[in-house]
Structure formats: C-alpha cells, structure tokens
A protein has these predicted regions:
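Metal-dependent phosphoesterase signature
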Residues: 49-87
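Conserved SAM-binding loop
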Residues: 1, 8, 97-100, 156-157, ...
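Helix-loop "lid/cap" segments that line or gate small-molecule binding pockets
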Residues: 22-23, 43-57, 111, 143-144
C-alpha cells in the first residue's frame, strides 16, 4: 500500500496555493512551498490548525472551506507523479496495490484518476474512509481486510513518520522513500529506506521470498 502525497505524487505547490488562497483575506503570512512541506501529512484539518494561532482558531472552519473550494478546482495544476512511479506500478503486476492517504477519499481518487494512476490500484482510501487516519493502524488494517491479505504479507510505502508508525502498529513491513517531503534522518525507523521508487520492485520480491 502506498501513501499518496510525497510518495506517488508531488502535490506541494497546489496545496500551498490553496492554503494561500484560504488565508489571504485574513492578513496572515504567505506560505512558501517549503513552509507547506513541513505541515503536510496529517490531512487538511490538521494542516489548517497548524497555520492558525490560538487566537485565530475560530477561523478554522472558514479556512477549510476556502481551502477545499480552491483546491478542488486546481487539484492538478502543478501536481505530477514522481519519476518512475508509473513504470514501477506497471512492474508490480503480481501484487495487490492500494493507496492509503490522509487526504479525503474523493480528492485522492480524483487526483489519481486525472494523473492516469488510478487504474494501477485495487483500492484507494482517504482520511474519511476507515474512521481513522494515519498514524493509526486502522486504515492499514482496513486495506488488509478489504484485499483479503494478512499483515505478514503486506507492506506500506511512504515518505513520513506517520506512514511508518501506522505500519508498525498494524504489523506490516515499512518502506520509506527519501525523495518526498521528509529527511532521511526522520525516516530511520522504517524497515527499509529507498532513494528511488524503482528499488521497490526487487525489494518486494525479496520480502515476499522471506
């Protein structure tokens, strides 16, 4: 199972643009892509909370609505899959594949469809699918159950500690990618760390043989 943002697709610019649209009327500091990258990972609700001060927390609902209004209309204006993602998915033909995102399910599906990636997956779930989001084990176990697998034969691939923690709690192997939104140092808890998604194909074969 794959994380979405920062693992399959670089969505940082479009998320940054949506955040800046949301906060513009309130005179808040304009965010750079680098600012946004530090905030991404726990879903839209937490994303908005992180940019609000305690005094401004009453604006959360309004900012979320403005964010979603803009983001849903500009979903793939700048977003694109990372290098070799399609090639890797095409080469993983013998395994069931799923997407496990902290982005809302409808947005996750639209993003993957518009980028021509949805056809590679047996299941796509978002933050609102299983009742909980990463780093909870619940969405991981939900996917395992839906696909008729066991934790022992499952792998989660992601770019953040949320992915690693969710995988560990669910008892699945964890693979961290270093090309996403987090540093290699922050990913050291993963069972495996890869710099290029193409490394996943031989790694999956190796894990399946053990």
């Amino acid at each position: 199972m794959f994380d979405l943002d920062g693992t399959l697709v670089n969505t940082a610019q479009d998320i940054t643009n949506a955040l800046n649209f949301a906060i513009k009327p309130y005179g808040m500091k304009i965010l750079t892509v680098e600012d946004t990258i530090q905030l991404i990972g726990e879903g839209i609700s937490r994303l908005v909370e992180k940019i609000l001060s305690v005094e401004n927390m009453h604006l959360k609902s309004e900012l979320m609505n403005r964010f979603l209004e803009y983001y849903s209309e500009h979903l793939i204006e700048h977003s694109k899959e990372y290098p070799h993602v399609k090639e890797t998915l095409e080469n993983l033909t013998t395994v069931k594949k799923a997407v496990i995102s902290n982005k809302r399910e409808d947005l996750s599906k639209r993003l993957l469809e518009e980028l021509g990636l949805s056809e590679y997956f047996d299941l796509i779930i978002g933050s609102d699918t299983a009742g909980e989001r990463k780093p909870s084990a619940v969405p991981v176990l939900y996917i395992i159950s839906r696909l008729g697998l066991s934790p022992e034969e499952s792998i989660i691939v992601g770019d953040s500690n949320y992915d690693i923690e969710a995988g560990e709690k669910a008892g699945v192997k964890t693979v961290a990618v270093t090309y996403g939104y987090r540093s290699r140092e922050s990913l050291m808890g993963a069972d495996y760390i890869i710099d290029d998604i193409r490394e996943l194909v031989p790694l999956v074969n190796e894990i399946s043989e053990t």
